[in-house]
Amino acid sequence: MREVMTTTMARNIFYGGSIFFIVIFLGLTLHSAHYIVNTSTAALPLTDSVARGKRVWEENACINCHTLYGEGAYFAPELGNVMTRWGVIDQPDDAFSTLKNWIEAMPTKVEGRRQMPRFHLTDDQIRDLANFLIWAGKANTQGWPPKDSG
């Protein structure tokens, strides 16, 4: 082996290494996409109602107070498992009525308690939000949140 690296040798090492790492990058990207689509997403299909519920979540800035899968503000409870905590994860009609009653009871005006503002959502918006929270509750969160209480 030569003690001096020629321009051709340097070019071949550069191109070979670049191709190697591009192949590794593409392989990991495809593996991640496959994992996300087939393993880590919710067990339910993404319906129009779920998408509208996500839009209600975003338009009313729910994440400014609540967390979803640990992301968001820690002022109010985690909502990724709220339908499980309420025992309505498999009953969309009960989930809707429970969420509607909760939202309509706010603010409670109880001294010393954090208050949720009244958003004046329509029944359709509340139903869509309930479906979104059911969908979120069925995602594979790998044990998050660590406590059932949220």
Predicted regions and their residues:
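Local sequence-structure signature of Cys/Sec-based thiol-disulfide redox active-site neighborhoods
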Residues: 54-60
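Short cysteine clusters
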Residues: 62-65
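Post-cleavage N-terminal segment of exported redox proteins
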Residues: 1-46, 132-150
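Extracytoplasmic electron-transfer domains, predominantly the class I c-type cytochrome c fold
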Residues: 47-48, 55, 69, 73, ...
